[in-house]
Amino acid sequence: MKRFIIFLFAFPYILFAQDQLTFNDILKIKNQDIFLKTVIEKGYSEGNSTANKLYYGLGLSKDKSEATDWAEFTTLNSEFYFEQSNLEYVRKYSEGKCYYDQIVSEIKSTCEYNKVMKHSSSKNGSVNFTTYKCSGAKYKGYLGFAQVDGNGVIQLFPK
């Protein structure tokens, strides 16, 4: 029981102490291989991937249906996204280490605003994203961000 209580207090620290996703990590993603390298090195585990979509999660459940954070890559168009779950909790307990907020701040300060673009998915429906063109990015397209149901999403809109 004592070990369990220690684990409960240590879990948030362990979760947030991982090597977090950065703006520079995202700028380097130019294809499926670099996406996989990034998520694997950041500690993500493969979820229920298909031939067309690669799903990776942090803190992935045994049945691979739930995770604290998600990353997805669509093989048909090289679209990708990263989702940090429960921003309110992360902001409160991570002592300023909310990687979604850090990445959004860097996008807004170093990239050029493009426009608001809609992205539709079966999970979230239609969502408006603020998009930017980032010089030095290896991907072809616009990087967007939005908050959806309390989660922070960084999304590539490929050209």
Locations of the language-model features?
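A local structural micro-motif
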Residues: 9, 47, 114-116
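N-terminal leader/targeting segments
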Residues: 18-85
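Short beta-strand segments that buttress and anchor functional surface loops
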Residues: 57-59, 130-134
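Short, exposed beta-strand-loop hairpins at the edges of beta-sheets
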Residues: 132-151
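Short, solvent-exposed mixed-charge patches
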Residues: 158-159
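Long, charged/polar, surface-exposed segments that mediate recognition or autoinhibition
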Residues: 67-127
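Assembly/interface hotspot detector across virion components, adhesins/toxins, and nucleic-acid enzymes
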Residues: 3, 15, 111, 115-121, ...
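Bacterial Sec-dependent N-terminal signal peptides
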Residues: 1-23
